[in-house]
Amino acid sequence: EAISYNDYINLIEKTVEELKSDSDTQKIVISRIKELDKHDIDLSETFKNLHQHYPNAYVYLRYDVEEGCWIGASPELLLKEENQLIQTVSLAGTKAKEDDWTDKEYHEQQVVTDYITATLSGFTNYIDVDGPFSVNAGFFEHLKSFISAQLIDKDKLYDVLKALHPTPAVGGMPKDLAKDFIIKNEGYNRT
């Protein structure tokens, strides 16, 4: 269920308080639902516009009887595999285009990169990290590193996927503490 703008601001303030507290939580990524009347939006036109404005993103349109319609554009590749070579990205740190990168954004990006490489280390022979690079995301920019690794056992690909998801870029860090906070406070089910 969608929450009001003021409730979302309150959630942001609560999240900041949690991060400043003695909690071990290092990062929490909150979100909210924006509900639109189905008559307010042309899905095919929106889908085309997302492709046009975010050419490097994974653009999706999904409909589920219970959950309704979800449409969006994600710049984050979770996992790709070909001949046991797996690829993913570490995407974190966001700023307005006109701003300069700060240590805060580089730290956020490194937390995600470290998490991904540590997770992959148990499944792979080697890991290569290229980046971070600044990437365009509409009105914003993100820091992105490309990560590739040689999978030891192709039968473990689904295990790798389960271990990676959700990355700290979409949930937080440590995963269990961030997930608990999100479940208790966001007011909707992200799955």
Annotated model-derived regions:
Residues A2-L43:
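Terminal domain-start leader segments
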Residues R32, D37-V111, K144:
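An anion-binding catalytic pocket shared by soluble metabolic enzymes
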